[in-house]
C-alpha cells in the first residue's frame, strides 16, 4: 500500500504540533532580595523568570510573618515576647531541625542564643561593652524548650529564639522544592552564603561555587580562596569572619 503524499503531510503536521505543544526548557536567571539579603537562582525550567520571582516573593512574605526577629508582628517575635506559644509548620520544622544539630554538636549550635546575640550587639541592637553573661546564661539552652502538640513550652518564659543561622538555608530548600515540583532537575539556588544545587549548569558541567578568603575586610574585596565544582548538594560558604 502506497503512503500518499497527503498522509505524509498530515503526519509531519502532527509531529510539528506535538513538538510545538511541549513546554520548552531553558536556563533562566532570577535575582532579588529576600530575608534582608540577596538571592540568585539559575535553573533549567519551563517556568518564566517572572513567575519564579513571584513565587519567591510569596515565600519571603511567608517566612517574615513566621520567623523574622526583625518584624515585631511576626509569630516568632510574639513568641519571644511571651504573647503566644502557638507554632506554625515553619517554626516546628526548624525547631526540630535545630534540636537535631544541637544534639549532634553537643550544644555548640543553639537557637536559644538570642539574649546573648543582643548582649554582644548583633541583631541590629546596641550591645553592652561588657555583657553580664552570668545573668543571661540561665535563659540559654536548647534543652530548655520543647514542642507539645503545636505549642512551644519554655522552662523560662524569658527564653527567646533566633533562627537567623538556619533561616536562609531553609528558604533555599523551599525554593528548590518549588523548582522540583515544576519539573526542574538542574538548578542552583543561593541566598547570601547558603545554597543548594542539582544536576548541571548551562554548559553541561558541575556548578562552580566561589569560596571567599576568610579575612575581616573581605566583605567588600570578595577575594576567592578557591572555586569548588559541585552538584547535588546543599552548602554554606560564609563563616564567622562575617560577624
Task: Give residue spans per PLM region.
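Mature catalytic core of soluble alpha/beta enzymes
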Residues: 2-8, 15, 19-243
Amino acid at each position: 500500500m502506497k503512503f500518499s503524499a497527503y498522509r505524509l503531510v498530515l503526519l509531519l503536521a502532527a509531529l510539528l504540533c506535538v513538538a510545538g505543544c511541549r513546554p520548552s526548557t531553558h536556563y533562566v536567571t532570577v535575582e532579588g532580595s529576600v530575608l534582608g539579603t540577596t538571592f540568585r537562582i539559575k535553573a533549567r525550567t519551563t517556568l518564566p523568570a517572572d513567575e519564579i520571582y513571584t513565587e519567591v516573593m510569596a515565600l519571603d512574605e511567608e517566612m517574615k510573618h513566621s520567623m523574622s526577629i526583625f518584624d515585631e508582628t511576626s509569630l516568632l517575635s510574639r513568641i519571644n515576647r511571651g504573647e503566644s506559644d502557638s507554632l506554625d509548620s515553619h517554626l516546628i520544622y526548624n525547631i526540630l531541625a535545630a534540636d537535631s544539630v544541637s544534639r549532634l554538636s553537643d550544644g555548640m549550635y543553639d537557637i536559644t542564643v538570642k539574649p546573648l546575640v543582643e548582649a554582644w550587639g548583633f541583631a541590629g541592637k546596641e550591645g553592652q561593652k561588657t555583657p553580664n553573661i552570668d545573668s543571661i546564661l540561665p535563659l540559654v539552652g536548647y534543652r530548655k524548650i520543647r514542642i507539645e502538640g503545636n505549642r512551644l513550652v519554655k522552662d523560662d518564659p524569658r527564653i527567646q529564639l533566633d533562627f537567623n543561622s538556619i533561616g536562609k538555608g531553609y528558604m533555599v530548600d523551599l525554593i528548590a522544592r518549588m523548582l522540583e515540583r515544576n519539573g526542574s532537575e538542574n538548578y542552583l539556588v543561593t541566598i547570601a552564603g547558603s545554597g543548594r544545587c542539582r544536576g548541571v549548569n548551562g554548559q553541561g558541567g558541575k556548578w562552580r561555587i566561589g569560596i571567599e578568603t576568610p579575612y575581616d575586610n573581605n566583605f567588600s574585596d570578595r577575594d576567592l580562596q578557591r572555586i569548588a565544582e559541585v552538584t547535588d548538594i546543599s552548602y554554606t560558604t560564609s563563616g564567622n569572619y562575617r560577624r
